[in-house]
């Protein structure tokens, strides 16, 4: 803040998924001094800029399985893609979450992510999640909020033509990236060997849609 206020015309670029934690450590907010840009995994439209229709179609299965992180494009071997995603989950995503406010129940957060992964596109009951995990509903809400802030998952509120009922409807949760979702449940099997192909497509289409908001 001091740099921006004292040096005319200067621009400072900061990156990182843990930027949300800075808001609790800064003495003063940067209201009016910042512009936030969210960078999602690559969109299908971006791939189409350097791949023809045939190439893009042939790559669809890989996108459904491994997602769209840019770094994955350099790996030709599927095992390398899997190892890359495992590294992101273990050393990056979970690390960010656990460091935040000193959370120690890593197994509960991972189990919560697995439950969400198996219920992609379905209405999710917080009470049911709490019961299955053996924790309170408030803790589930807190964990979901953190997972949203580090861009692992996002919610789609329930819909009803009756606005009063809409408020009480359960949310649906989706992953920002299919690869992370599959990494959480440790399933990178090919499409013909899976029973969750519909969920993969729904999550992929939903994540593509949010990239254009």
Listing of model-derived features with the role each one plays in the protein:
Residues 1:
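Conserved AAA+/SF3 P-loop NTPase catalytic/coupling segment centered on the Walker-B
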Residues 4-26, 147:
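Sensor-1/coupling segment of RecA-like P-loop NTPase cores
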Residues 7, 38, 212:
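Acidic-histidine catalytic/liganding microenvironments
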Residues 9, 33, 57-60, 150, ...:
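A structure-centric signal for secondary-structure junctions around beta-strands
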Residues 13, 35-37, 174:
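Hydrophobic/aromatic beta-strand patches that form the interior of the parallel beta-sheet core
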Residues 15, 39, 156-158:
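Conserved beta-strand termini and adjacent loop/short-helix elements that scaffold enzyme active sites
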Residues 17-19, 23-125:
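Interdomain motor-coupling "hinge/lid" segment immediately C-terminal to the ATP-binding subdomain
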Residues 78-213:
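Accessory nucleic acid-recognition modules appended to NTPase machines
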